[in-house]
Amino acid sequence: MPSDRRPSQRRNRSKSRDYRGARSKVTRADTRNRDDTLALSMYQGPPSADQGNNMADAPRFGFWTSVSQCLQYLWARRHLGLLLLLFWTLVILFRPVNTAKLPILAEAAELEPPLGNMLDFFFPTACIIRDNQVVVACNNQPYLSESECLKSKCCSSTSGTIIKCYAPVRDKPTQVLRVFGLAAISILVLGFLPMCCCSMCWRRKRMNRMLKVLKKQKSKGKKPKGRKASEERALLSH
């Protein structure tokens, strides 16, 4: 009887050793497969001929495609309306205006304060008379006193001119500098805004791709228990 038990115990020990060895082989194979998948995801090697044809058939991501995608994203986020509103305000501000039809400073002061301030900014005036400038009497009264002239927001002249109180003259150098500065700032803003939008969209796409890769790796790492058991049985049978 004890002699019969000893070979059975030896057989059970040999079976347990074989089972442990097969299980260790399965775990090693799983770790190798995971390392291979990680290496393939990090570096897939140079593209083959079939991959090159597929890449040629696939849509190419260029500057205009990124711009169109950014515009679609902005339209979905309802930010494109604000950009269009800003663009049309700039167009209205920089449209050509006939200076002969503009009112004088006294009439502009009677307008609303925001519009009057805007006209003062884009069409500044000064009391300095430059060469070949026509002088107009203040309120059609050229012989007003200095106090009345200042009350009417006009310029008084103490030199030997015919008109002692005249309306302010257009300051063209200051106007050119202001318009040029505002145009330069608006061009810079409108130039960098699409670039910023494109960079934001590109970063978002890159983050989405990275998240997709991580999800795929996690899904590959989490294998079902039934599949592991079938692999262990197959190795034990061999």
UniProtKB/Swiss-Prot annotation:
Region (Disordered): 1-30, 214-238
Organism expressing this protein natively: Mus musculus
UniProt keyword Iron-sulfur present: no
InterPro entries for this protein: FMR1-like (IPR055331)
Segments forming a coiled coil: none
Cytoplasmic side: 1-79, 200-238
Residue ranges annotated as Extracellular topological domain: 101-178
Aminoacyl-tRNA synthetase keyword on record: no
Lineage, broadest ranks: Eukaryota, Metazoa, Chordata, Craniata, Vertebrata
Membrane topology listed for this record: Multi-pass membrane protein
GO cellular component, one term: membrane
Domain of life: Eukaryota
Biased composition (Basic and acidic residues): 15-30, 228-238
Positions of transmembrane segments: 80-100, 179-199
Protein name (Swiss-Prot/TrEMBL): Fmr1 neighbor protein
Compartments, as annotated in UniProt: Membrane
Basic residues biased stretches: 214-227
Domain annotation P-type: ranges: 118-176
Alphabetical UniProt keywords: Membrane, Transmembrane, Transmembrane helix
